[in-house]
Amino acid sequence: MTEKKEMEVVKGLNVERYMGRWYEIASFPSRFQPKNGVDTRATYTLNPDGTIHVLNETWSNGKRGFIEGSAYKADPKSDEAKLKVKFYVPPFLPIIPVTGDYWVLYIDPDYQHALIGQPSRSYLWILSRTAQMEEETYKQLVEKAVEEGYDISKLHKTPQSDTPPESNTAPEDSKGVWWFKSLFGK
């Protein structure tokens, strides 16, 4: 078994430019998201204390599921884009903290496309500022993931609408049933 090289992460990430809405173009399946989720996206907002408010949303069977959390630099003294994200689960009774790694492996110079991973290579996200991504750009990000040692056979594209839904107009799955069902592979 060959040892995988350490992943390269972005250095000098401009956190303020990174804030805003990002659409999930593709990802590895996650037990924290419904298998049939569409229009999945994340919205990041800088808090006054320097942490980041995280809002992850997805739509499943016409209902909006969401979870909120926070992100912060894993090592405040490092210029590497290695963040920690923390969510409290389950969403309907948020009492258990779950912390994970969020490493920015690539960001284009205009901050329009990003590749996000973490050290175990169990999770991977391709993100875009727009709901659709040019195929050539997608292929370049997939190639970057391969270079970083990811098994892209697990990567699946996330269906995105041409006109993404608005958060305040969709019925909510307020009980977090999507999260609970996703634990059982539904």
UniProtKB/Swiss-Prot annotation:
Tissue specificity of this protein: Expressed ubiquitously at similar levels, except in dry seeds (at protein level). Present in seeds.
Keyword Disulfide bond: no
Induction text: By drought and heat combination stress. Accumulates upon treatment with 50 mM (beta-D -Glc)(3), a Yariv phenylglycoside that aggregates arabinogalactan-proteins (AGPs).
Coiled-coil region list: none
SUPFAM superfamilies reported for this sequence: Lipocalins
Region (Disordered): 154-174
Pfam hit, one: Lipocalin_2
Keywords assigned: Cell membrane, Chloroplast, Cytoplasm, Lipid metabolism, Lipoprotein, Membrane, Plastid, Seed storage protein, Storage protein
Observed effect of gene inactivation: Increased sensitivity to sudden drops in temperature and paraquat treatment. Dark-grown plants die shortly after transfer to light. These phenotypes are associated with an accumulation of hydrogen peroxide and other ROS, which causes an oxidative stress that leads to a reduction in hypocotyl growth and sensitivity to light. Severe defects in basal (BT) and acquired thermotolerance (AT) leading to death within 7 days. Stronger sensitivity to tert-butyl hydroperoxide, a reagent that induces lipid peroxidation.
Record comment regarding domains: The HPR motif (90-97) is required for intracellular targeting at membranes.
PANTHER family: APOLIPOPROTEIN D
Biological role stated in the UniProt entry: Involved in basal (BT) and acquired thermotolerance (AT), probably by preventing plasma membrane lipids peroxidation induced by severe heat-shock (HS). Lipocalin that confers protection against oxidative stress caused by heat, freezing, paraquat and light. Confers resistance to high salt (NaCl) levels, probably by protecting chloroplasts from ion toxicity via ion homeostasis maintenance. Required for seed longevity by ensuring polyunsaturated lipids integrity.
Official protein name in the record: Temperature-induced lipocalin-1
